[in-house]
């Protein structure tokens, strides 16, 4: 299963780890399907670290899960933040996942087993690079606003019904 984020900078295609992070993927896919992420800005952009989005309030403090509250972390020891393009739930402590997520710009081993890793970028690394190079203010907010315009969900024909 995969999705494509259509952003103001271009497309980013993400493969989802539905078997390893089923709850995070269910939440993410349902939010994508309901157009929840449409218009969400990339509100935090730290070169060589990560870019964060998924907050419809644009404050970096908002967002809800499909269950209306936080949901638990899903950690798999084999899944590591070991490269550019890891996609994880943002949180503010254990079991506080909602709607915000981030994409890494490089290996970030210190995030392992602290943030639910639920996917990886498989196409659109040029778009990710373009976003990474955008100038930011002192709070890491892009000076030129970048956002998710809409999302395409791609069905996996090999997946069981």
From Swiss-Prot:
Keyword entries, A-Z: Isomerase, Rotamase
CDD domains the UniProt entry points to: Cyclophilin_PPIL3_like
EC number(s) from the headed UniProt entry: 5.2.1.8
PPIase cyclophilin-type domain mapped to chain residues: 1-153
Domain of life: Eukaryota
GO molecular function: peptidyl-prolyl cis-trans isomerase activity
Listed GO biological process terms: protein folding
Record's catalysed reaction(s): [protein]-peptidylproline (omega=180) = [protein]-peptidylproline (omega=0)
Disulfide bond positions: none
Assigned protein family: Belongs to the cyclophilin-type PPIase family. PPIL3 subfamily.
Cross-referenced PANTHER family: PEPTIDYL-PROLYL CIS-TRANS ISOMERASE-LIKE 3, PEPTIDYL-PROLYL CIS-TRANS ISOMERASE-RELATED
GO CC terms, sorted: catalytic step 2 spliceosome
UniProt name for this protein: Peptidyl-prolyl cis-trans isomerase 10
PROSITE patterns reported in the protein's UniProt record: CSA_PPIASE_1 (PS00170), CSA_PPIASE_2 (PS50072)
Native source organism of the sequence: Caenorhabditis elegans
Matching Pfam families: Pro_isomerase
Known role: PPIases accelerate the folding of proteins. It catalyzes the cis-trans isomerization of proline imidic peptide bonds in oligopeptides.
Entry keyword annotation includes Isomerase: yes
